[in-house]
């Protein structure tokens, strides 16, 4: 479903600020894989997701989604294959528009659009049923402005919008990091439910090692732009946070310096 082949990306090449973010990265995801991604600051996690999404061109290598080489496609062109949820709940929705208008825009992604958003009765009923699955009461607030929603409600709506067309690949970029623990748990549980029910191939960056172990069928750890640990199946299920810390120290030769990841 997704192949990252020998991908490298360096920022500010040839300057004193030169930084190699991805260093010959190789990764293959099978259809339906739910991969959690961990690593310290600057490990290349978000750069990897941005490279896959086409936010910036890679220096070398190939990116293939569902058998299509998308390496030279723009971010807009890749949007037909990808759904994405960012860390900031304000990203991915239009605050001044109604909930149903946001859903209509998401439903028509990749299709011809007009300046006017006309929503049929059938579409409105479909949106109501989708929102009901969130169990947040939003199905009764279709005409509410999105800017009035809480961070958790808005992130849940963004998740719904990113997945309603069943993308080939779902990218979750620390999408619960800005939420309080109780709300984060609800959004994570909802994410896992949507991924499983729709059999979505997913990559989820998380700062929480416990969540990385709990969710998904596979876990990868990144360091200095490449993958240093890749585990799945029963071995992943039996992992402890202490195991991940030990693996990091062995593979990288250093201590894990992100207390937020260790203590979460």
Spell out what each predicted region is.
Residues 1, 10-24, 74:
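A short, flexible loop at the N-terminus of ABC-type nucleotide-binding domains that lies
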Residues 15, 69-83, 91, 113-116, ...:
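ABC ATPase NBD coupling module
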Residues 38-40:
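The feature captures the beta-strand-to-loop junction immediately N-terminal to the Walker
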Residues 61-68, 229-231:
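Conserved ABC transporter NBD signature motif
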Residues 206-207:
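H-loop/switch region of ABC-family ATPase nucleotide-binding domains
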Residues 226-252:
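Conserved beta-strand-loop-alpha-helix hinge in the C-terminal portion
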């Amino acid at each position: 479903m997704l192949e990252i082949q020998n991908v490298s990306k360096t920022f500010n090449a040839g300057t004193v600020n030169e930084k190699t973010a991805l260093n010959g990265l190789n990764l293959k995801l099978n259809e339906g894989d739910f991969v959690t991604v961990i690593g310290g600051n600057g490990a290349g996690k978000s750069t990897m997701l941005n490279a896959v999404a086409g936010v910036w061109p890679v220096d070398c290598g190939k990116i293939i989604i569902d058998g299509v080489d998308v390496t030279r496609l723009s971010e807009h062109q890749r949007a037909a294959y990808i759904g994405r949820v960012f860390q900031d709940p304000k990203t991915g929705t239009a605050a001044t528009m109604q909930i149903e208008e946001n859903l209509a825009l998401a439903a028509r992604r990749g299709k011809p659009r007009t300046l006017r958003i006309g929503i049929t009765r059938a579409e409105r009923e479909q949106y109501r049923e989708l929102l009901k699955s969130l169990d947040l009461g939003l199905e009764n607030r279709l005409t509410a402005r999105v800017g009035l929603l809480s961070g958790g409600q808005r992130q849940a709506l963004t998740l719904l919008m990113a997945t309603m067309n069943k993308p080939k690949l779902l990218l979750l970029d620390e999408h619960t990091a800005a939420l309080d623990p109780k709300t984060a748990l609800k959004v994570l549980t909802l994410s896992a439910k949507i991924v499983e029910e729709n059999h979505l191939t997913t990559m989820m960056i998380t700062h929480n090692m416990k969540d990385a172990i709990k969710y998904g069928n596979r876990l990868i750890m990144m360091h200095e732009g490449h993958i240093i640990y890749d585990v799945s199946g029963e071995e992943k299920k039996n992992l402890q946070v202490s195991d991940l810390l030990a693996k990091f120290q062995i593979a990288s030769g250093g201590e894990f310096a992100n207390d937020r990841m260790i203590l979460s």
